[in-house]
Amino acid sequence: IRTKRNRVHAEINALKKQGKDIKQVLKDAKKLPGELKKVEEKRIALANEIGEILLTIPNMMHKSVPKGKDDTENVVREKIGKPKKFSFDVKSHGELAEELDIVDFDASAAVAGNGFYYLKGDLVLLNQALQQYGLNFMIQKGYIPVEPPLMINKRATQGVVDFETFRDMIYKIEEEDLYLIATSEHPLISMFVDKILEENQLPIKFVGISPCFRKEVGSHGLDERGLYRTHQFNKIEMIVICKPEESYDYYDELLGLSKELFKSLGLPSRVYESCSGDLGDLKAKGADLEAWSPRKKDYFEVCSCSNLTEAQSRRLNIRVRKGGEKYYPHTLNNTAIATSRAMVAILENFQNKDGSVDIPKVLQPFMGKKKIEKR
């Protein structure tokens, strides 16, 4: 239609020069803008539809991912540290925290509903100590600290997650194209949307610190009054943007740093690799670090490490220039420490018979004490 429009304009000019009648040609020309608008609207609609379909295509898994139907077939790869044997009946973290008067779940439920909490006294200090220790730990390992925005738009959100699957987990701001972040990974990766990086800028290694917000809630029962699965929590998150041939080396590095961090806290843990049936659509490979719960006599997730290869960089149009060519970099993410879950592990693993809780040695300088006791 644009070609026809150009041709008609040329024809009108030619007819004018020849002194001929241009009424019919003008009549035809006036129809063209409307026709062009209709076709352009159809083109945009089809492009959007194609884009939505492309977003549903999953990533290719790495050949080393164990095969399995769901999380019951995930594989234990390694255990770090031995669980402590207690000479008394251990309490859940929620019981301990309430008895020590360092948390108030009833007050938070009254003002915000279930899945929130008021931290008090030494638990506030422990929460802050974990964030500062985790941040310092990763800075010393070469990661640059970043404090990101706590809200991002739909384009950014779609670029980092399977939006249709993730939609029910995230909070949307009414009448705004903004969503509260579920992890700082999302704004850290989308920070580079539509950008072309030079290869000598790689690797990009960030450690983000932020509150996080999710709609997910915990299971019913005693541990629902707790810190394990909540709507709001603080997290130290790591991301890497790197050359494709280096991404699995960084995957090992990220997972290794989480193991080292939790070992330094004195918490028994294990590496639990996701099988094919439990791996998210965008992940090529992933594993959780799980801490030991003496109350449940089982491990629970505290960290998650993933290699998403090109999935996010393609969706966000992040490219790297090498000479005269461009390619999509690989992206990875890893939980350095989600403080609420780390506090669950510390309260349960370091509890004493008298109801007090020992503070891990590496955190004592941040808290100025060795033990949490009832005031």
Report residues per predicted region.
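N-terminal alpha-helical targeting/anchoring segments
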Residues: 1-84, 102
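TRNA-recognition modules of translation machinery and tRNA-sensing kinases, especially anticodon-binding
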Residues: 79-375
